[in-house]
């Protein structure tokens, strides 16, 4: 059992209340939140790990990310979804070549530092799967299959199946592969 004693707890309830001088009792999930002065009455202080922090708040989940594009932000057009999607298709080949572990690691650290605990990562190439599977982020890893020219259908389908199989081999408590089917 762990106890996190907090000066303030920012709640994301309907009223966004702020609890002052409260503690969060948890193991794998939150069991109880109560005022700090009620901790002694529970009789668990001697057997629990006790930590303290000035502020605690819920972590954030970014439901739709594209970390594989992190190396190409300057080449993509962010003036609306249609412009962005067009720029992704135009720069598709360079996107996968420019990505590396250093860039991915930097992006994962930025997410964690900003309070993000989990992501829905949409991936066309699968290059970020191994790194996400080992990271502290919780990831729903969507293997994308994009609409394609009929001449390349078999090739695109085979590549997708291989990416999805590889992602499933990495599945763990924090990394869960899934499917994302697009047809632009």
Residue ranges of each PLM-predicted region?
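Short acidic/polar active-site loop segments enriched in Thr and Asp
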Residues: 117-118
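Flexible loop residues that form catalytic
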Residues: 12, 66, 124
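Metal-coordinating catalytic core of metallo-dependent amide/deamination hydrolases
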Residues: 130-184
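Short loop/helix-cap segments at secondary-structure boundaries that form the rim of catalytic
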Residues: 37-45, 130-136
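Short, acidic/polar
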Residues: 99-110, 123-127, 155-164
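Active-site gating loops and adjacent loop-to-helix segments of metal-dependent hydrolytic enzymes
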Residues: 70-102, 140-146, 161
